[in-house]
């Protein structure tokens, strides 16, 4: 008997077949660099920076920016942002810089140039006759890179959220050490004309390069990061959520995974912790792998590890976390089952902690405490099974365990308890639910059961 086949009749004829469905066609690519070559892009001929500044500023004022010219200018302007490397900087075996080296964002990557000239048109007319200062260059670079952040803000953020962000960014780039070079609201007007620029590979690459540089190098113009910070751990929401989750429940990654009682976690956990990826290395290329073009399909996104993502945010919802209530449910990754497990884990970690004395008046008190704890452990080991369960908890110190949670789930037939449902409904009904959010899912799924 083939376990994958089903048998049925059609017009009295027995049919045996294997049901096959559409599978995920994406091939996840890991970002590890194996050829010891820095990330690389190719741009047009390097421009005269003064001419390029005037052209790009003119285009910004007219809300008509040429993406090729903008990228060429941003790459050339890297020379203005020289800083000192604080430590030897290596990633994936590549030596980026030695301690004390003077470096610019260009030191992190390779930018190849062709002989093709840019347009460098004066779309908005000629306003600046003198050559720009370094602070004016820095302001223009900051405003241009902020277009990346604005284009990453999703439509789910309602009201004037994006406009308010643009206003705050403009304020940064019109105060020292920057200088005002555009009129108010120019940034938002320009953004509307290039709202999808985060999808342009070269622009995204340059945003990631600037962010990687300013995240490590102390610099007068480090505030430029306000527009590029979204490139850090981009398309890593699954891994980022897991990291936040283990900090929230105060467990190690290994301890937390022991609570993941579902077969669909197996492939995702293997995918998320593929060896050799520098996930835990500070200032690695890994942090900006998406923008630097090291992976076309991230294995760390919410879609790539959807069951893990769903579980984490159902636990977050149980604990009343706004971030989890607002997050988008991965509908194809068993949200109903994940909500059940999330309820039990939420109950396990909500309003409960493991505590012990760690600070003492003097060394004598510390030694007395340690001796008392040792005695308590010896008593627990010699336990003959006659103490009641409350004392057993006290002596063993075992207030949390995957085995206990798993047993409770099995005893309840894999269903949520009424107390879980009441908690879910309580946190979700008091929240302004966004479309397809966890709050909306919980409200629609469990509100009638409460």
UniProtKB/Swiss-Prot annotation:
It comes from the Viruses. Keywords: Capsid protein, Helical capsid protein, Host cytoplasm, Phosphoprotein, Ribonucleoprotein, RNA-binding, Superantigen, Viral nucleoprotein, Virion. Phosphorylated by host CK2. Unphosphorylated protein N seems to have a better affinity for leader viral promoter encapsidation. Phosphorylation of protein N in ribonucleocapsid may stabilize the interaction with protein P, thereby playing an important role in viral transcription/replication. The modification Phosphoserine is found at residue 389. InterPro entries: Rhabdo_ncapsid, Rhabdovirus_ncapsid_C, Rhabdovirus_ncapsid_N, Rhabdovirus_nucleoprotein-like. GO terms for cellular component: helical viral capsid; host cell cytoplasm; ribonucleoprotein complex; viral nucleocapsid. It is found in: Virion; Host cytoplasm. Pfam families: Rhabdo_ncap. Signal peptide: none annotated. Disulfide bonds: none annotated. The keyword Ribonucleoprotein applies. One of its GO terms (molecular function) is RNA binding. Belongs to the lyssavirus nucleocapsid protein family. Homomultimerizes to form the nucleocapsid. Binds to viral genomic RNA. In nucleocapsid, binds protein P and thereby positions the polymerase on the template. Protein P acts as a chaperone on free protein N to prevent it from aggregation before encapsidating genomic RNA. Encapsidates the genome in a ratio of one protein N per nine ribonucleotides, protecting it from nucleases. If expressed without protein P it binds non-specifically RNA and therefore can bind it's own mRNA. Interaction with protein P abolishes any non-specific RNA binding, and prevents phosphorylation. The soluble N-P complex encapsidates specifically the genomic RNA, with protein N protecting the genome like a pearl necklace. The encapsidated genomic RNA is termed the nucleocapsid (NC) and serves as template for viral transcription and replication. Displays a superantigen activity in human and mouse, activating mostly V-beta-8 subtypes of T-cell receptor. This is Nucleoprotein.
